[in-house]
């Protein structure tokens, strides 16, 4: 396929540095998308329509099982701005927009520096702004959906640019319409609603303990952000040093009957009642009870400080990760009758 300048296109591109697991893989073509015009130029190419495509953000939610025989679109769209202040039934809020290629953590810290709290519990989550709604991230008592306003995305099939609100994003637990239609949509920019009537969310046990240890009884948003950063750095490996994709499995959500069966044998199991009557379980606890915490299988392993994180001990490939994930799933299911679902996308 002939692509004319100014597109930043690379052939036989190395994807190793572009995924936080550090898995070896190459792409037939890599396009660095720095604006909507780059996507439109690519869509105008006659050979584009029929080939495989992969939209890539920070590569922190990805397991590459081998080379990719198509075009990888590496989203690097920058920009941050205050759109304005909106008054609605929920009160006044700052509407803040960021380009999809912005580093998520840097964006969070920037909003706090501007005096716009609301995203502090989501500090230090790896990845980009554009990937955050795709994965529907959440941590330490706050879900992205609580702060999400809208996003703009381009349909790679039709070339149409469309805006999505909470309803049309069809958010689910660590899920969205974009994740279910992988390769179709490229997120361009995301807008967030940050309430001016801010209140801290510090009820999560780890956050409360960290704040107490710091002697902070009335935390501000920056205090919560600092606490979350400290917790994550203690518990989770730095991808720059140890390859990983963060939390590898979703916390399973079961019905009351399934929880009753588990509680009869393991009343100590961590559990979190949901509004709809279901029960969210701690995948890390299930994995640890199955004996996997700190164990290795070939060049990959289960992190010794957090069983929910799978790590590349050095020289691993995507199939090694898939093999370990399957072994953990099988053991947890055999012991508890619960099937764990991976968070990362396998390609």
UniProtKB/Swiss-Prot annotation:
Pathway in which the depicted protein is active: Cell wall biogenesis; peptidoglycan biosynthesis
Enzymatic reactions: UDP-N-acetyl-alpha-D-muramate + NADP(+) = UDP-N-acetyl-3-O-(1-carboxyvinyl)-alpha-D-glucosamine + NADPH + H(+)
Keyword NADP attributed: yes
Subcellular location: Cytoplasm
Domain FAD-binding PCMH-type: 23-197
Cofactor requirements of the protein: FAD
InterPro entries: FAD-bd_PCMH (IPR016166), FAD-bd_PCMH-like_sf (IPR036318), FAD-bd_PCMH_sub1 (IPR016167), FAD-bd_PCMH_sub2 (IPR016169), MurB (IPR003170), MurB_C (IPR011601), MurB_C_sf (IPR036635), Oxid_FAD_bind_N (IPR006094)
Keywords: Cell cycle, Cell division, Cell shape, Cell wall biogenesis/degradation, Cytoplasm, FAD, Flavoprotein, NADP, Oxidoreductase, Peptidoglycan synthesis
Top-rank EC class of the record's enzyme: oxidoreductase
Catalytic residues, chain numbering: 174, 247 (proton donor), 343
One GO CC annotation: cytosol
Keyword Transit peptide in record: no
Pfam family, one: FAD_binding_4
GO biological process, one term: peptidoglycan biosynthetic process
Gene Ontology molecular-function annotations: FAD binding; UDP-N-acetylmuramate dehydrogenase activity
Enzyme Commission numbers on file: 1.3.1.98
Primary role: Cell wall formation.
HAMAP family tied to this protein: MurB
Similarity section: Belongs to the MurB family.
PANTHER family tied to this protein: UDP-N-ACETYLENOLPYRUVOYLGLUCOSAMINE REDUCTASE
Name recorded for this polypeptide: UDP-N-acetylenolpyruvoylglucosamine reductase
Organism: Azoarcus sp. (strain BH72)
């Amino acid at each position: 396929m002939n692509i004319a300048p100014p597109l930043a296109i690379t052939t036989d591109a190395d994807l190793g540095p572009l995924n936080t697991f550090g898995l070896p893989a190459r792409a037939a073509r890599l396009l660095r998308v720095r604006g909507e015009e780059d996507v439109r130029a690519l869509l105008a190419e006659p050979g584009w329509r029929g080939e495989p495509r992969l939209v890539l953000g920070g590569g922190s939610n990805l397991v590459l099982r081998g080379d990719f025989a198509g075009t990888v679109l590496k989203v690097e769209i920058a920009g941050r701005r205050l759109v304005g202040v909106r008054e609605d039934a929920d009160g006044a809020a700052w509407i803040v927009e960021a380009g999809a290629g912005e580093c998520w953590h840097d964006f969070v810290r920037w909003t706090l520096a501007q005096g716009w709290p609301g995203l502090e519990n989501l500090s230090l989550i790896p990845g980009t702004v554009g990937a955050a709604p795709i994965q529907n991230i959440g941590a330490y008592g706050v879900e992205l959906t609580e702060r999400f306003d809208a996003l703009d995305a381009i349909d790679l099939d039709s070339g149409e640019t469309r805006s999505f609100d909470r309803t049309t994003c069809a958010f689910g637990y660590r899920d969205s319409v974009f994740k279910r239609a992988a390769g179709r949509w490229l997120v361009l920019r995301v807008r967030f609603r940050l309430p001016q009537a801010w209140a801290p969310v510090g009820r999560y046990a780890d956050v409360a303990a960290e704040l107490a240890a710091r002697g902070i009884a009335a935390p501000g948003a920056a205090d919560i952000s600092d606490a979350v950063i400290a917790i994550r750095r203690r518990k989770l490996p730095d991808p720059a040093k140890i390859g990983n994709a963060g939390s590898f499995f979703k916390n399973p959500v079961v019905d009351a009957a399934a929880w009753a069966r588990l509680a009869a044998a393991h009343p100590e199991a961590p559990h979190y009642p949901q509004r709809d009557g279901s029960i969210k379980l701690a995948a890390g606890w299930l994995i640890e009870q199955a004996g996997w915490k700190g164990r290795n299988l070939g060049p990959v392993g289960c992190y010794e400080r957090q069983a929910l994180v799978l790590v590349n001990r050095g020289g691993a490939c995507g199939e090694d990760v898939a093999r370990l994930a399957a072994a953990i799933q099988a053991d947890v299911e055999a012991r508890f009758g619960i099937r764990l679902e991976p968070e990362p996308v396998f390609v």
